[in-house]
């Protein structure tokens, strides 16, 4: 057991449902070698992993699964873009030729896809945003700077994300430079909220089934309406054919102790989307929060515990994984 941690390893665990950003790896950053080693041994021991992320399938591959031995990848499922699609792997380690389901391809015409992106362009112009490619935030600050109007834009197909790296807590001086108001929300002037409110108006007026919502630390996710981490997980856990691709059946994970949720943002007040993973399974399933959050902000009735080892975020999960040895 990890020193100073009161949370012990779950010896009954069969399937872990895990967030990605800041839980397995830092944002837009490959998982560290030690994490890859632990995930590989976790899978080699017969455990299964369901990665649930607002990020794209390409990012999960580039930052995590491509580093894992090919023969172990078939034990992994990936719900990306906040539940818009669920993918798996072939026995040889290649990605399946098509997702197990795709709300995006099933419901969006080419015209709707184009109209969605025109609205994104309109938002960028109205708010005077300067979009840049995605990168580690340290690199972004070094090469681009800290102006709140400089953002990262990530078109993931089934989801478009604006990373408002410098604008989640605007100062009085920064607010004076903007030609539009930014509302005070939970004690902060968060530029994402102003953009989100306008995006809601535009999507509604144009009948585009997209919902803007806060995600991650500084992300504004423009996600398909009605789709969430919860819906994708529930769909998979109810489908024996999908579960069979990772060597499981519904009967294998009936006991709440056979499942576990790993995440880092469960706070309702601060837009924590990892709570949606917990909401997809029995409230008795243990959810481990690897960020220091206020438990009073968690959804009521769920078994959410805060990791109390030496480290937090992805280093906290690494510590937890290492504690089983």
Regions found by a protein language model. Give the residues of each.
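Active-site phosphate-binding/coordination module
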Residues: 30-151
């Amino acid at each position: 057991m990890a020193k100073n941690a009161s949370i012990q390893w779950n010896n009954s665990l069969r399937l872990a449902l895990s967030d990605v950003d800041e839980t397995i790896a830092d944002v837009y950053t490959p998982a560290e070698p030690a994490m890859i080693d632990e995930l590989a041994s976790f899978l080699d021991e017969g455990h299964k992993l369901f990665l649930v992320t607002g990020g794209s399938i390409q990012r999960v591959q580039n930052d995590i699964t491509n580093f894992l031995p090919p023969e172990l990848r078939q034990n992994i499922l990936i719900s990306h873009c906040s539940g818009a699609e669920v993918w798996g792997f072939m026995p040889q380690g290649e990605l399946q030729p098509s997702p197990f389901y795709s709300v995006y391809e099933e419901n969006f015409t080419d015209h709707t896809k184009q109209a969605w992106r025109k609205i994104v362009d309109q938002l960028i112009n109205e708010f005077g945003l300067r979009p840049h490619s995605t990168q580690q935030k340290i690199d972004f600050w070094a090469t681009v700077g800290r102006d709140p109007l400089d953002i990262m834009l990530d078109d993931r197909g089934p989801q478009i994300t604006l990373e408002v790296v410098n604008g989640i807590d605007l100062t009085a001086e920064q607010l004076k430079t903007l030609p539009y108001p930014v509302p005070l929300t939970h004690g902060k002037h968060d530029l994402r909220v102003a953009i989100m409110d306008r995006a809601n108006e535009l999507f509604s007026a144009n009948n585009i089934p997209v919902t803007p919502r806060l995600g991650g630390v500084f992300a504004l996710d423009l996600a398909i309406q009605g789709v969430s981490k919860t819906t994708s997980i529930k769909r998979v856990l109810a489908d024996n054919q999908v579960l069979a691709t990772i060597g499981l059946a519904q009967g294998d994970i009936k006991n709440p102790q056979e499942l576990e949720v790993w995440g880092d943002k469960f706070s309702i007040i601060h837009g924590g989307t990892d709570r949606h993973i917990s909401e997809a399974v029995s409230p008795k399933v243990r959810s481990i929060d690897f960020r220091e959050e206020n438990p009073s902000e968690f959804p009521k009735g769920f078994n959410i515990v805060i990791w109390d080892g030496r480290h937090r975020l992805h280093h906290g999960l690494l510590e937890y994984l290492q504690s089983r040895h």
